[in-house]
């Protein structure tokens, strides 16, 4: 009883009210910028470019997305500069490898992309969990996480295809980045056209895991956020 009363008093305290009002006034455009960067990355990768330079450009786009997510989530400057350092090291190493004559740096660079795109959802979710209000900013952040998950799996499939000795897909030997991106989002949304299927056991297991996580995320997180946003609007 004492703990419940203490929690109630904290929520009703002026400082708590001020914090809630401050969160409500936080601009939604910050996660909107993250969303725009994700759409730009998606459009670039889906256009079907090929070559080592594609992975370098993807590092730039994913690095910018991670930095925007860190800024939108209110992360510390130390974490922000650490992310900048990782991106710069990856770009310098990848560019140097191309200049010295390394024929294929796609695999290592897409592993770096996997790290960057995997860190961004963690940062965003950590920020959203701490929020006391559900508003447009919260919903935009949750949508960013959903798209980031699809890109994370596409980079994971790309890495498997790059390092594996056998083709990733049963229907195609030389898959492009666009093919992996297409397969990932078709799997996550459970559309499942069937024109691409994973050939190996690891690819199939990850595809099933992506479909499960994607559907659970939609029917629980997004649905609950949107419904709560609607109730708040009617109550106000």
Residue ranges and their predicted role:
Residues 47-62, 83-84, 106-118, 178-181:
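Structural signature of hydrophobic alpha-helical transmembrane segments
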Residues 174-235:
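Pore domain of cation channels
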Residues 27-42, 84-89:
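Alpha-helical transmembrane segments
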Residues 1-26:
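Short, Lys/Arg-rich, polar N-terminal cytosolic tail immediately upstream
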Residues 77-89, 106-115, 134-145:
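Cytoplasmic-side transmembrane-helix entry/capping segments in multi-pass membrane proteins
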Residues 117-165:
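Pore-domain transmembrane helices of cation channels
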Residues 49-51, 152-182:
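Outer-pore turret/helix-boundary of cation channels
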Residues 42-56, 69-78, 99-100:
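Short, hydrophobic transmembrane alpha-helix segments
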